[in-house]
Amino acid sequence: MPRKGPAPRRPLVADPVYNSPLVTQLVNKILLRGKRQLAETLVYAALEGCREKSGTDPVVTLKRAMDNVKPTLEVRSRRVGGATYQVPVEVRPARATTLGLRWLVTYARARREKTMVERLMNELLDASNGLGAAVKRREDTHKMAESNKAFAHYRW
């Protein structure tokens, strides 16, 4: 095992248009096969669409969507004496943001709209209003943690 400890977290550079690290993270989640320019174009177009549809600042819409999607609890498998328990644990803030963005992008890709810009825009708007598949995923995760609360004493 390495003795140096974990690698330090590198700071995220805020994106040039909205000056927000959250938008940079969203671009990184959308990015496929190194095509950053395409990912940025998609995200900026989706955020502009959010501005037109909702009439509010797109970064505020994104933050509201993230607040509705970020989980506070999740379950982790823990093996105790031959049995595997689903143990509820609190989610660290950085992981909560990562999970929230991952779910937003995953469920945006699964939507039925024609273009990715429309899919991402509508998923963001739905999530900011407390609707959509990403919010449902968070509710399911919390429900799972709630139903396994009896195993919380196995936490590590």
UniProtKB/Swiss-Prot annotation:
Top-rank lineage group of the source organism: Bacteria
BP terms from Gene Ontology: translation
PROSITE patterns in the cross-refs: RIBOSOMAL_S7 (PS00052)
Cellular component GO terms, alphabetical: small ribosomal subunit
Keywords: Ribonucleoprotein, Ribosomal protein, RNA-binding, rRNA-binding, tRNA-binding
Keyword tRNA-binding: yes
Xref: InterPro entries: Ribosomal_uS7, Ribosomal_uS7_bac/org-type, Ribosomal_uS7_CS, Ribosomal_uS7_dom, Ribosomal_uS7_dom_sf
Keyword Ribosomal protein recorded: yes
Signal peptide positions on this chain: none
GO molecular function, one term: rRNA binding
Subunit structure as annotated in this protein's UniProt entry: Part of the 30S ribosomal subunit. Contacts proteins S9 and S11.
Protein's job: One of the primary rRNA binding proteins, it binds directly to 16S rRNA where it nucleates assembly of the head domain of the 30S subunit. Is located at the subunit interface close to the decoding center, probably blocks exit of the E-site tRNA.
Family: Belongs to the universal ribosomal protein uS7 family.
Protein name per UniProt: Small ribosomal subunit protein uS7
Species of the source: Salinispora tropica (strain ATCC BAA-916 / DSM 44818 / JCM 13857 / NBRC 105044 / CNB-440)
